[in-house]
Amino acid sequence: MTPLSHIRNFSIVAHIDHGKSTLADRLIQSTNTVADRDMKEQMLDSMDIERERGITIKAQTVRINYTAQNGEEYVLNLIDTPGHVDFAYEVSRSMRAVEGSLLVVDSTQGVEAQTLANVYHAIDADHEIVPVLNKIDLPASDCDRVAEQIEDVIGIDASGAIQVSAKTGQGIMETLESIVQNLPAPKGDRDAPLKAMLVDSWYDSYLGVIVLVRIMDGVLKKGDRIRMLSNNSTHNVDRIGVFRPEMTAIDELGPGEIGFLTASIKQVRDTRVGDTITHEKKGTEVALPGFKPSQPVVFCGLFPVDSSEFEELRDSIEKLALNDASFSYEMETSAALGFGFRCGFLGLLHLEVIRDRIEREYDIELITTAPSVIYHVYMKDGAMIELHNPADMPDLTLVDHLEEPRIKATILVPDDYLGDVLKLCQDRRGIQQDLTYAGSRAMVVYDLPLNEVVFDFYDRLKSVTKGYASFDYAMIGYRTDNLVKMSILVNDEPVDALSIMVHRERAEGRGRAMVEKLKDLIPRHMFKIPIQAAIGGKVIARETLSAMRKDVTAKCYGGDATRKRKLLDKQKAGKKKMRQFGKVDIPQEAFISALKMDG
């Protein structure tokens, strides 16, 4: 049993690509936690997609034994948190499970928007923060400038910042020593009733759900009956252990320690991140503060390209949901796309990760409909409906008003591109809240509708700033606006997968852009096809895709004009009939391209 004074719990805060996982690898390697022959890049990122995209999605943990310079043995528990904005709730929970953070900043690039967001999570959790300047082996490294920036932008003292190169291993020992010297030891009472925070959970096909816990008070032993405070479910603990990084069984976990338990739990949905775990008898009734069930923010439809793969898609979605409590799904049918699922996600990265995993791990080709957000529709009879799919919009004559979700977006951008960024935010109905400068970079804060950000805002931001801007957002609530549902009709048939909610003032421009794109993307048929954008019954934009023409008069030589006329009239009647009964095939890329906004 390690005394509390010799435990240090910490996390690493960094923007994507600033070297967080590499630093974690070096800390593990230099303390011989993992033998050199077992070492691999991004040791803690277990999903292939985490390694491939170079991001951390689930919180991972490792226990490191370190002998300090004063000769004493310390136990260091590292929780490697996700850095991306979609997983902000996971970050805030992981932060509450530890007492300190290493703030890793790339000394060639400086502070980025996600660094800021995660540092604020750390400050909210009352962390002691140790700044670490990484990548000092690169010629473009400028530690003084970046240290100054940390002080200006974040407001913490960076005079004692540790300079490291996670790649070469320089400065790693100083980092370990600094963790022991500067970060506080955890507090906790061994004799109090058990109070443990559920930091993360994932599904294992042999053990059921594995739960990552941080013990606040009391002791957790193998064989204990435990209870979750959020839903009062009880379970029997059949295994307890720690990660070194592989799972290692131990007998008990005491205050301040971070480890895992298994209790034959069948579904990840029963173990909610941030929940409080206690003993069934003589447990605590006071939950740890800050728990909230995760709510999906972005919705979209997932349909198999080949409709015979629907059952495989259902299996894959059910398996992914086992491991991801923030992912929700329900069955949906679409006239254009057949059977599929309407899924809810935390944000766009979360959507992409799930879609990539289905395509890669289960080999199913998918059609993704336009992402949409949750609108609040207030009816004239006083009822309020949550609208997840624009195709389900009730009749406008019954609707009193609509509210849409707004976000507070923080964008860090070099001065040279500021004008383009302001124009982009203005174009997306943004309201400027703040503009400050730190050195040669500007920090802009905008109030934006989530609907305008959800599809391709991030791509557009990256392209107008040549990839230099960084972006982070937080939800701020709902506001009324003049929104309407725009439908797209192809050959007079509405295509439900292309329905979108737009601001009334922008509907015409957006509709015109979409029908022009569809005209280029839909292949020509034997009959002419009108493509229209409509609000209610009013058509606001139209393009006509002309028919392919067969020369029916080719075999008439000279002679009588009435013969040609007769053949042409017959062709005309045939085309009219075809148009009435013909089915228009819309290719998959037409769905995605039509929804991408240019400009």
UniProtKB/Swiss-Prot annotation:
It is a peripheral membrane protein. This is Elongation factor 4. The keyword Nucleotide-binding applies. It comes from Roseobacter denitrificans (strain ATCC 33942 / OCh 114). It is found in: Cell inner membrane. It comes from the Bacteria. InterPro entries: EF-4 (IPR006297), EFG_III/V (IPR035647), EFG_V-like (IPR000640), EFTu-like_2 (IPR004161), G_TR_CS (IPR031157), LepA_C_sf (IPR038363), LepA_CTD (IPR013842), LepA_IV (IPR035654). The keyword Hydrolase applies. It is an enzyme of class 3 (hydrolase). GTP binds at residues 17-22, 134-137. Required for accurate and efficient protein synthesis under certain stress conditions. May act as a fidelity factor of the translation reaction, by catalyzing a one-codon backward translocation of tRNAs on improperly translocated ribosomes. Back-translocation proceeds from a post-translocation (POST) complex to a pre-translocation (PRE) complex, thus giving elongation factor G a second chance to translocate the tRNAs correctly. Binds to ribosomes in a GTP-dependent manner. Residues 5-187 form the tr-type G domain. Keywords: Cell inner membrane, Cell membrane, GTP-binding, Hydrolase, Membrane, Nucleotide-binding, Protein biosynthesis. Pfam families: EFG_C (PF00679), GTP_EFTU (PF00009), GTP_EFTU_D2 (PF03144), LepA_C (PF06421). One of its GO terms (molecular function) is ribosome binding.
